[in-house]
Structure formats: C-alpha cells, structure tokens
Amino acid sequence: ESHPTRYRLSHTNEIWVRNGVRVNAGSKHQKNGGDIFFQCLKLCCISPSSSLVDRTVFGEFGLFDEMLPACEDYDFWLRFCAFEEVHFLNEPLLIKNGGHDQQLSKKHWGMDRFRIIALEKLLQDPRLDNFKRQETIKELILRLQILIDGGRKRKKNAFVKKLAKKKAMLEAMFCNEKEPVQCE
C-alpha cells in the first residue's frame, strides 16, 4: 500500500487586489508545488498568509529573520525550498491586497539589498548541493548588478564601488572553476 507524500509546507493560490481592483497575477507569479527552489531564487513565490508550516520546520530551518526589514519571507522560503518540496493547493483561499502605502516594497528602497543578504546566508549552508550553489551565485551576481545600476543612476558612488567589488570577487572566484557559473 502506497502512502501519500507528507509535506511539511503547504500553500494555496490567492486572489490579487490592487488599489481596490482585482488584477491577474503575472505569469512569473504563478504558484507551484514540488521542488520550487529555482522559482524561489527569482522571487518570493509563497505568501506567508497562504501557507501552513509544520512547526518542526522552524526548529530545523530557523524562523523568519526579523533582522531583515523586508524580504524575510524570501529568505525563509529559500532556506526551506533548497532542501524540501512543498505542497500547493490550487484554490484561491486568500485575497491579497496591494498598492497601499504600508507595503514594504513601497517603504524600502532597493529591496534587492535584503535579497542579497538572504542569498549570501543561503550560500553559508554546507548542505546546499553544487548546482543549487551555482544557481544561487548567479542570482546573487544578477541582484548585485541590479543594485549597481540603480546606484549609478542615483549617483551613489561609494555604494556602487562596494557592490562592484563584491560582484567582481564573486565572478573571479566562480567564473574560473572547472564547472563555471555562466557570468554575463
């Protein structure tokens, strides 16, 4: 007799409302289940409000990082999804309201600053396999470039210099290995 897979994290679909008007989520925001790590690298693809998490997960992976002013959910899902699959119930059981001033994405500039911290934290985990590590590094390099471009546009020279140095170090370390990260 076969037993169904026991997932420790489950999430549902959601209805999006922006400024009081229902909107369709873009294709990149489509929810999924299974091994969604690579989708999680690109964006926060699980809404904490639509998820059920077995409490043992927090003992193993830690809590949401309250030191991050934003993107603490991105950080948590990365740490979890790097090692476990998730269940997805394709029913819109949540109404997600956006477009208001309380949204963290409107409150903080350069949200990629916090995603970079999450990616760097994930790279510290020795359990991360080589392929996922390389993909994480590629995403980190991409996020650094986004912030560099934004810093140049806003003439934040010291900020740009610091990030460019970090990006160059990553590219030098990982673009010259036997199995190099594709650096663009």
Say what each PLM segment does.
Residues E1-N24:
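Conserved donor NDP-sugar-binding/catalytic core segment of glycosyltransferases
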Residues A25-A118:
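Conserved nucleotide-sugar donor-binding catalytic segment
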Residues T12-E14, S50, I148:
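Generic short beta-strand
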Residues H3-P4, C40, L123, R152:
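Hydrophobic residues in alpha-helical segments
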Residues G98-E184:
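C-terminal subregions of glycosyltransferases and related glycan-biosynthesis enzymes
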Residues V17, R22-V23, V57, N97, ...:
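Generic alpha-helical hydrophobic packing signal
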